[in-house]
Amino acid sequence: MSRIGLKTIEVPDSVTVTKEGDNITVKGPKGELTRYFDPKITFEQNDGEINFSRSSESDKALHGTERANLASMIEGVLNGYKKTLKLIGVGYRAQAQGNKITLNVGYSHPVVLTAPEGVSVKATSATDVEVEGVSKQDVGQFAAEIRAVRPPEPYKGKGIRYVDEYVRRKEGKTGK
């Protein structure tokens, strides 16, 4: 049994959820999200609550997944999502201009990344980067792309990491 799929979702008054064909649209104070919703899973909306049901037992995993996706869409249009990254290393800098971020992280050239639509990026300081948006998927994906430019290395800890990330450190070679 899908325990997550059986949980109801509370929909606040400021959020509207509509289904048109196989797409589901969620509108809220921060924005609007549209996504494909599998027709094998049905949902009923009553008095600010959404309940999900599936057509067959083989759709258990899909049941929980679609419920979790809709819950994250509602959370996104209500509060938004934010990921913060930190650049650690001598001379590592970040500069944001509009929806582009320029990273100087030890390469011979600056690395320029463009944020996808619906995602904003800003450099709060020379070594801190914030990625914000309404889509959990887009925010997480763009933050992962920034981190992939220079992932943290285990010997000195240099690189780009999430603020809450723990980097396991290794010992260097022991000299004679």
Swiss-Prot record:
InterPro entries: Ribosomal_uL6-like, Ribosomal_uL6-like_a/b-dom_sf, Ribosomal_uL6_a/b-dom, Ribosomal_uL6_bac-type, Ribosomal_uL6_CS. GO terms for molecular function: rRNA binding; structural constituent of ribosome. Coiled coil: none annotated. One of its GO terms (cellular component) is cytosolic large ribosomal subunit. Keywords: Ribonucleoprotein, Ribosomal protein, RNA-binding, rRNA-binding. SUPFAM superfamilies: Ribosomal protein L6. Gene3D superfamilies: Ribosomal protein L6, alpha-beta domain. NCBIfam families: L6_bact (TIGR03654). Part of the 50S ribosomal subunit. This is Large ribosomal subunit protein uL6. The lineage of its organism: Bacteria, Bacillati, Bacillota, Bacilli, Lactobacillales. The gene is rplF.
